[in-house]
Amino acid sequence: MRAENIQHQKNNCGKAWVAYMEKKVTIVIPNYNGKRFLDDCLSSLERQTSKDFETLVIDNASQDDSVSYIREHYPWVKIAVMRHNLGFSGGVNVGIGMCTTPYVLLLNNDTRSFPKMVEELIKTMESADDIFSVSCKMIQFHDHEKMDDAGDLYTCLGWAFQRGVGQPVGDYREPAEVFSACAGAAMYRRELFAKVGLFDELHFAYLEDLDLGYRAKIQGYRNVYCPTAKVYHVGSGTSGSKYNSFKVKLSARNSVYVNYKNMPLPQLILNAPALAAGYFVKWCFFMKIGFGKDYVDGLKEGISTRKKCKKVFFRGRDIRNYWQIQKELWENTITYIIELAKRKL
C-alpha cells in the first residue's frame, strides 16, 4: 500500500466494531497543504444528520502540518499519509481502494457541508440501481447567493463546464441527469468501480471526474444531480487562482485524453470539426489572458502521450449509449451557450 501511516479510530468492544463495519458511506477527502480549510470541512461533517459514515483523509505529502492538526482536533478521522503528492486522481484512488462501504463520497477539503448532505445523497443513490454517481448542489463559498456547480456537462467542442455556475442559488432546485458528477462533492457506488474503472491517474488532476462519468455513461449507468444535498465550495483551494500555468496546461492535455479514450474513431471523426473549433477558441481566450503557450503545450503533450491512456473498449451492445452521449454533446453545447449568455447579461 502507498500509505505511509494510517490512523484508525479505535473500538473498545466487538459490538462497536460491528457498528463501525456496517457504515454505508466512506467520505474520502484528498488534502494537500489544506490546513486552513480543514476546520470548516470536518466540523461540518460532525453536524451531519446521518451518522452512517466514516471519514478518511488522504494526505498528499502536505508540508503545512495538516496531519498533526487533524490528529489533534479530529481524532475520529482516519488518515492515510502519502510519501509524495499523487494528485487528485492518485490520492482518491488510494482512498477508494481502502473503502469497504457500499458508497464512497468524495469531498474537497475546501467545502463546508449542509447538515443533510450525506442523508440526501444516500436517499438518491438508493432510489435506483443504475445510478453510478450523485452530484451535490455546490454553492459559492464567498457568495452564498450564487451557484458553483449543479453537475458537470460536456460539449462537442471538447469543453466541460459547471452546470449553473454563477446563476442564482434559488435555481436548479430539481433533480436532473448530468454528464458527470463534480468529484469535489459527489457520491459513487463503490461496486461499479470494478466495471467502470477508477480515476485515471494519468490525468493527475482536472477532468478526471468527467472522464470517469463518461466511461460510466458508455456502459449505460447514470450520473445524477441532487439539489437537496448542498455544500459551500471555495474553489481552486489547492491549485490557487482560477487560471494558472499548471491548471491550463493540465486541463488542455486532459481534454485530449478524454476524447481519445472515450470516443471510438467514427465519433472522433464526426466531432473533429467542432473539436478543432473549440480548441481554437480556447487558444484565443488563453492568448488574451497570457496563457496561450501553456494551452498549446498542454495540447501537444496530450497528442504525443495519448496512447498511454487505456482506450475504452468498443462493444456493439453500447452503440445506443454512444448515440445518446452524442446527442447530449450537441444539446450541452446549446446549454453552454445559453448559460454563457446569462452570465454576460
Which ranges hold each PLM region?
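Glycine-rich, basic loop-to-helix element that forms the pyrophosphate-binding segment
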Residues: 81-99, 109-111, 120
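Non-catalytic, C-terminal membrane-associated alpha-helical segments of glycosyltransferases
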Residues: 268-345
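A conserved acidic beta->alpha catalytic loop
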Residues: 44, 59-68, 84
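Short aromatic/hydrophobic "clamp" motif used to bind/position activated sugar donors
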Residues: 104
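A recurrent flexible, glycine/aromatic-enriched loop bordering the glycosyltransferase active site
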Residues: 146-147, 159-161, 167-188, 205, ...
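A short, conserved alpha-helix in the catalytic core of glycosyltransferases
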Residues: 179-230
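Short, acidic, metal-binding catalytic loop of nucleotide-sugar glycosyltransferases
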Residues: 43-52
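Conserved donor NDP-sugar-binding/catalytic core segment of glycosyltransferases
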Residues: 111-155
